[in-house]
Amino acid sequence: MKLNSLILKWYDQNKRDLPWRKTKNPYNIWISEIILQQTRMEQGIYYYNRFISKFPDLESLATSDEKDVLLLWQGLGYYSRARNLHHTAKHIYYHLDSKFPESYDELINLKGIGDYTASAISSICFEKKHAVLDGNVFRIISRIFGIKEPIDLNNSRKVFKKKAIDLLPKSRYGDYNQGLMDFGSIICKPKNPLCSDCLISKKCVANKNQLVDSLPVKAKKNKIKTLYFEYLIVNNNNQ
């Protein structure tokens, strides 16, 4: 069975019950993805429910005052996310006739939406063939295929992105992408992964070669040394 089929099978049996998965509405998926940036899942669920209660749809967010959005965002930090949400909501509401863009190319041109979020929205909501690439996906791909390219270098990112695209199934792109994210959070965790429960362990290069704890690889950062200089000034009759 192919890797993508195994992930879909696992997802069908083990997917997490998350509030934004009860809908395919791009507004809800967008809000959840932005909130979950730099935010733990438990905290993200709380803030998502609170945000949707206050701003249940695009119109309510677009027609609100920015100060109200920022007030609701308190505790999440990175306030540029909230400002970008408000800006993009107004743009879609006033300039796109409230119609959320469906394609990756349109989505990525919106303020605050990058490669990952554009791929997630287009695949989950509109079944567009796009691969997500986040920490979970980097980790899964690196371990399964034994890829030792540093995940935090731009050139390496292209390698992982190509592999992620090649692994896409023939359908159910959104479910597959969400399956990867869940699999990385529950099974192929950064620390203490559940390799004994992993249905891909027999195919996993890292597992077969005891490399699980060393993959994925991050580039070594040069330590910045602080240099101190002492100066001695001798004044000899103003000469």
State where each predicted segment sits:
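Catalytic cores of DNA base-excision repair glycosylases
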Residues: 4-194, 200-211
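N-terminal strand-loop-strand
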Residues: 213-239
